[in-house]
């Protein structure tokens, strides 16, 4: 008599994201760092401890001069939004950051397009906040006593 085959247990669905009810929003935090050299789109959970996904504009394009372009930022944001949907995150709070400190306090060209790409890809937008670091009193700015001469 041949040996009996062990009964296979029914396969369970394993979800990576949080357990939620239908129609409930699950928030994450999208931190967009837009300098004039590159754009970072970094999504974490609400506490900021666990990174869900991080994509950089320089990864999405080949030419160095295009790293900070709005197009590269848009591609990065679309990738991040797709990954968030896989994990069950449906809404994002946005924190936009420029270089700050002794650098410029104006976000680079990729900030606006990254935000628009997140919104157009179906993510609900919660709060939008500017978290550029501003010095209360810092080290001396470059340029010398008479400033930058053009």
UniProtKB/Swiss-Prot annotation:
Component of the ribosome, a large ribonucleoprotein complex responsible for the synthesis of proteins in the cell. The small ribosomal subunit (SSU) binds messenger RNAs (mRNAs) and translates the encoded message by selecting cognate aminoacyl-transfer RNA (tRNA) molecules. The large subunit (LSU) contains the ribosomal catalytic site termed the peptidyl transferase center (PTC), which catalyzes the formation of peptide bonds, thereby polymerizing the amino acids delivered by tRNAs into a polypeptide chain. The lineage of its organism: Eukaryota, Fungi, Dikarya, Ascomycota, Pezizomycotina. It is found in: Cytoplasm. This is Small ribosomal subunit protein uS11. The keyword Protein biosynthesis does not apply. Keywords: Cytoplasm, Ribonucleoprotein, Ribosomal protein. Residues 126-150 are annotated as: Disordered. Gene3D superfamilies: Ribosomal protein S11.
